[in-house]
Amino acid sequence: MDTTSRRAVPELGRAKREAMIECIASIRELAEINPAGFIKSEDKTVFPGIEPGTLEKFHARAKLLATPDAKPYLRAPVRFPAAELELFFDIEVDPMRDVCYLHGFVERRGADNATEQFVAFFSGEDTAESEEQAFAAAWRYLLASQPCAIYYYSKYERTIYRKLRSKYPHVCSEAEVETLFDPTRAVDLYCDVVLKATEWPTRDFSIKTLAKYLGFNWRDPHPSGAASIEWFDRWMTSRDAAVRQRILDYNEDDCRATRLLLDGIRALARQS
């Protein structure tokens, strides 16, 4: 790994890199500092816009990146909902067409991977009617699956469901959406767990990066949300069943990657 560039430290953006450049020019230098030497007061460091806790966080991440064979770890306790049924949830959206064209779920029972199955609700058209039908079907599925624990990665799913509720208010109410995403039953693994409670020896904390670190491989050679949008565009013009299946497979793999990450974090908790 290149340990000369600080760009590889997760969440260390350009403004913060520039604030530190005169004193700290590389990951290795950041890993070797004593953060206390740069702290001016309880809430300030010598670097504008960087608080002591933030500097200590970047220092810890740099140490992981600069250390051969470093392992991820928990820096805070984690708790997850107790549920027999777990749903791992991912959506696909075409922002140019302004359509949510796929709601995908991998369901697992009793923490047994042998029980896993993929459930998908696909909008085969870019029309409001088709989008609404897929959303309504996904919503009925979610209601029928209760009680369960829901896992997703980043705020995107919740944001899009709020938007869909506004577009199609008779499918569900605002209160029902907020209840669905209540953190006691629905967990944003990225914002509420990975960022708040874990550290990883990786350049970023994307689901692709962390799941690959844990050994997961996507079936598609070029997996990405942007690629899925391109495939949906091709589906719209070709109606090629193979293209549709490629979209579904990619979404299923994203859901399974989320499940693998949850299991990986649970393993870290058992080790700590």
Language-model regions: role of each:
Residues 50-87, 91-92:
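A contiguous, basic/glycine-rich beta-loop/short-helix subdomain that forms a polymer-engagement track
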Residues 118-229:
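Conserved DEDDh/DEDDy metal-dependent 3′-5′ exonuclease domain
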Residues 35, 92-94, 110, 155-156, ...:
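An acidic- and aromatic-residue-enriched active-site/binding cleft used to recognize and process polar
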Residues 81-86, 91-134, 140:
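Metal-dependent catalytic core segments for phosphate chemistry
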Residues 33, 89, 108, 151-154, ...:
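Generic beta-strand/beta-sheet core signal
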